[in-house]
Amino acid sequence: VYKRQMGDVAGGLQFTYISLDDSRIVKSQLLGDGSRTTENRGAIPYSVFLDPPLSRVGLTEAEAVKKGHAVKVARLPAAAVPKAKVLRQTNGLLKAIVDAETGQLLGAHLFCAESQELINLLKLAIDAGIPYTELRDAVYTHPTMSEALNDLFTAVN
């Protein structure tokens, strides 16, 4: 099945980066091997640029349960993150939804400083099937918002 529309006219999420990926899909279909499709683009992150930004990727807790996953949830107040303190932006919350049986990250919701950057790391983790323990135990630079992942994923229960 060929993709016949790109961008906003194609329906679905109306983000610039979706239009960019649509063009990659069409190029793959017209000039390549056709291997790039909407089905293999992976989890789609998005951010709403509030103060602090709100970013999301993957499933919500309710969606995960509805799909039959037994879930574990982790929550971390943004005020617990050293970089948030440095930035004086301690309002917010980080939340992750994990499959209780496989340890796979199913979704994340970040309402915190620099969430628009951090969400992309979690998108890659979802797409690559990286278990939450890898994110929990990784070494991150300090002070950065990404080091919040150590504490967030330690809170999985």
Language-model regions: role of each:
Residues M6, Y17-R41, A70, A128:
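Internal hydrophobic alpha-helix adjacent to the cofactor/substrate pocket in enzyme cavities
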